[in-house]
Regions:
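Glycine-rich beta-strand-turn "strand-cap" elements at beta-sheet edges
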Residues: 1-8, 41-63, 85-110
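Terminal low-complexity, poorly structured segments
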Residues: 4, 9, 33-36, 70
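Helix N-cap motif at beta-to-alpha junctions
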Residues: 19, 67-73
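Short amphipathic alpha-helical segments
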Residues: 20-48, 81-89
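Short beta-strand segments enriched in hydrophobic/aromatic residues
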Residues: 15-16, 68, 81
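A beta-strand edge to alpha-helix "cap/lid" segment located at domain peripheries
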Residues: 75-78
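Short glycine-/aliphatic-rich beta-strand segments at the starts of folded cytosolic domains
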Residues: 8-17
Length: 110
């Protein structure tokens, strides 16, 4: 086990109103996401992970996990995330719930 107090984690839950909203965001992300991620990684984002919530009876929920190495890295990324939200969620009905915290333990298989 490893403890690293410097890793900041953001867990975001996204709930879409329709499959059309999901498809629109996915299409936009496919087109513009790589350029946004390049900028975010340059600003200090350590990792990005997106997944489908499967223990709910809906294909309209997903999670996104972001990790940052420092508060400064997070602050450098926030303006870019504002651009991402504006571009990805324009004319989309979505509920976004975000939680930020400091990782207290991280375990990975060797």
């Amino acid at each position: 086990m490893e403890k690293d107090d410097s890793i900041l984690t953001n867990i975001t839950l996204q709930t879409f109103a329709s499959e059309g909203d999901v498809a629109l965001v996915d299409k936009r992300w496919e087109k513009d996401g790589p350029a946004f991620l390049q900028r975010l990684f340059a600003a200090g984002l350590l990792s990005y992970e997106k997944g489908q919530i499967w223990n709910k009876d809906s294909k309209l929920m997903r999670f996104v996990i972001f990790k940052y190495g420092s508060p400064e890295a997070l602050n450098r990324c926030l303006p870019i995330w504002k651009e991402v939200e504006k571009r990805m969620f324009e004319n989309v009905v979505i509920k976004v719930t975000a939680y930020r915290g400091v990782s207290s333990e991280y375990v990975a298989a060797n």
